[in-house]
Amino acid sequence: MPRVKRGVTARARHKKITDAATGYRGRRKNVFRIAKQAVMRAGQYAYRDRRNKKRVFRALWIARINAAVRQHDMTYSVFMNGMKKAAIELDRKVLSDMAIADKAAFAALVTRIKSVVNAAA
């Protein structure tokens, strides 16, 4: 069996890691053993935070909707319950956007939901 020299593959592997670690501070950017750990940890953080990002944005949308709805003397939970009863299927992202960008349309939506909630009560 012929001897395999691994210089090319080792260099490619090291280069891949050190390229991923560019911009890091200290020895993390150029010492392979330390850079490898830093890149692995960065990947873990990226994986975790791609999931957390969804939670954070949903919380932001809910906070915005709640603030906008409270200006019309209503709470978020009553508003969302009214949305279900009125069979209006707008997601929180769109509602949040509407509350900021198109206040008139949002106000019309709130008045419609108020009428649905008052009719049910």
Swiss-Prot record:
Q: Which UniProt keywords apply?
A: Ribonucleoprotein, Ribosomal protein, RNA-binding, rRNA-binding
Cystine residue pairs: none
What are the GO cellular component annotations?
ribonucleoprotein complex; ribosome
Please list the GO biological process terms of this entry.
ribosomal large subunit assembly; translation
What are this entry's molecular-function GO terms? rRNA binding; structural constituent of ribosome
Recorded superkingdom: Bacteria
- What family does the entry list? Belongs to the bacterial ribosomal protein bL20 family.
Q: What does this protein do?
A: Binds directly to 23S ribosomal RNA and is necessary for the in vitro assembly process of the 50S ribosomal subunit. It is not involved in the protein synthesizing functions of that subunit.
Q: What is this protein called?
A: Large ribosomal subunit protein bL20
- Provide the gene name from the record: rplT
